[in-house]
Swiss-Prot record:
Name of the molecule in the record: Elongation factor 1-beta
Stored Gene3D superfamilies: 1.20.1050.130, 3.30.70.60
GO molecular function: guanyl-nucleotide exchange factor activity; translation elongation factor activity
Keywords: Acetylation, Elongation factor, Isopeptide bond, Phosphoprotein, Protein biosynthesis, Ubl conjugation
Residues recorded as bearing N6-acetyllysine in the entry: K7
Positions of modified residues (Phosphothreonine): T88, T93
Record field: compositional bias (Acidic residues): 96-113
Source superkingdom: Eukaryota
Pfam families (UniProt xref): EF-1_beta_acid, EF1_GNE
Spans annotated as Disordered: 80-114
Post-translational modification: Phosphorylation affects the GDP/GTP exchange rate.
Quaternary data: EF-1 is composed of 4 subunits: alpha, beta (alpha subunit of the eEF1B subcomplex), delta (beta subunit of the eEF1B subcomplex), and gamma (gamma subunit of the eEF1B subcomplex). Interacts with elongation factor EEF1A1.
Protein family: Belongs to the EF-1-beta/EF-1-delta family.
Amino acid sequence: MGFGDLKSPAGLQVLNDYLADKSYIEGYVPSQADVAVFEAVSGPPPADLCHALRWYNHIKSYEKEKASLPGIKKALGTYGPADVEDTTGSGATDSKDDDDIDLFGSDDEEESEEAKRLREERLAQYESKKAKKPALVAKSSILLDVKPWDDETDMVKLEECVRSIQADGLVWGSSKLVPVGYGIKKLQIQCVVEDDKVGTDMLEEQITAFEDYVQSMDVAAFNKI
């Protein structure tokens, strides 16, 4: 198991593919598995590796709490796809002190080249397999509660304003008015979003911008698809 060399573009690509249908390295909450892989990555993945970049930024937000995240940090080779070998840090000997340098290391260099060739072959095979599979897009179904100011608010106009919000990765669904008391009704509206493109913060910001109609917005239900 592993991701190849996480300091290389090929290794980051493996990580990106692995996270295409996952929020975390293991399970459904941040854990020491995420910390171990995060620390092996030298910096933010490029923008075209959207799944890896999403995960990196999310785990980075736990920087102060990482020691308290659940689980036990294990070797990198215990995480990731089963058919990829971990090679991150295989070049760490470059940082040794001069006293530790093997002046007769030609055999090791030959072995290193052989290991590199095998690794590149395995990664090429893995990429070939992944290329044949359709990319999975992580989506969520969200139910929003949109509350008006009072019973005189034009709810038809309020819904028109909400549905006027358009974004790549956002699809509006069914809606209904739900009584909340004192003659006031709230708008309950369903939407499906692509997780990497649309978030609840963005929805709240744009919906509450219609301040003539909208008092507040809450997430009533959130489910991964």
